[in-house]
């Protein structure tokens, strides 16, 4: 089966409309073509502007599915093309809340013991969403997750921990670990100041 979406302009007159669609592809290495006729009944109804906030999860690390199963590098032209297709399509179907995967790139402090944050990549994504999507709300990325995705599993967080050599490593730590608390104490004030 196939779902065919046909946008109906708000000023379209009610009545029956006829059309056709041609679908082509490959089956067992051979080109196939199918033509189908269809009829659409348009009713004299105009829906009010959507008031519901709608979010759907999307996964940029799965953009390969939109790119002939080829890996899509983050922040590449192919990445932004996949993102554009995704947000424009989802917006057309009513999505207006967007999950922000970028949280700010950690930057070790000069002494190597703490972190500051570079929010330029996050800003780039926000600006992109504002240009290409219906945005009523931007949802921050989930900070803590369940360790095995079960409702009763303990929370953990994947946080950057300074390595003492001017860089950092990500570590998956229990939510109540002092290093997670140190990250929270550095991150949220920096984010608030940036916003």
Task: Enumerate the predicted regions with their spans.
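Aromatic-lined carbohydrate-binding surfaces of glycoside hydrolases
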Residues: 7, 18-25, 32, 36-195
């Amino acid at each position: 089966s196939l779902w065919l979406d046909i946008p109906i302009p708000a000023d379209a007159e009610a009545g029956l409309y006829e059309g056709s669609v041609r679908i082509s592809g490959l089956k067992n290495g051979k080109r196939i073509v199918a033509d189908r006729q269809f009829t659409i009944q348009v009713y004299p109804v105009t829906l009010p502007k959507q008031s519901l906030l709608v979010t759907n999860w999307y996964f940029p690390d799965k953009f390969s599915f939109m790119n002939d199963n080829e890996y899509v590098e983050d922040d590449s032209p192919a990445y932004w093309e996949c993102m554009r297709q995704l947000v424009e399509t989802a917006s057309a179907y009513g999505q207006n809340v967007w999950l922000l995967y970028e949280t700010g790139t950690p930057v070790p402090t000069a002494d190597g013991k703490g972190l500051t944050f570079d929010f330029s990549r996050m800003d780039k994504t926000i600006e992109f969403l504002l240009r290409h999507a219906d945005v009523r709300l931007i949802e921050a990325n989930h900070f803590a997750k369940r360790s095995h995705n079960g409702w009763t599993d303990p929370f953990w967080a994947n946080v950057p921990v300074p390595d003492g050599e001017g860089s950092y490593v990500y570590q998956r730590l229990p939510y109540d670990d002092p290093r997670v608390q140190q990250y929270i104490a550095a991150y949220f004030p920096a984010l608030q100041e940036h916003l």
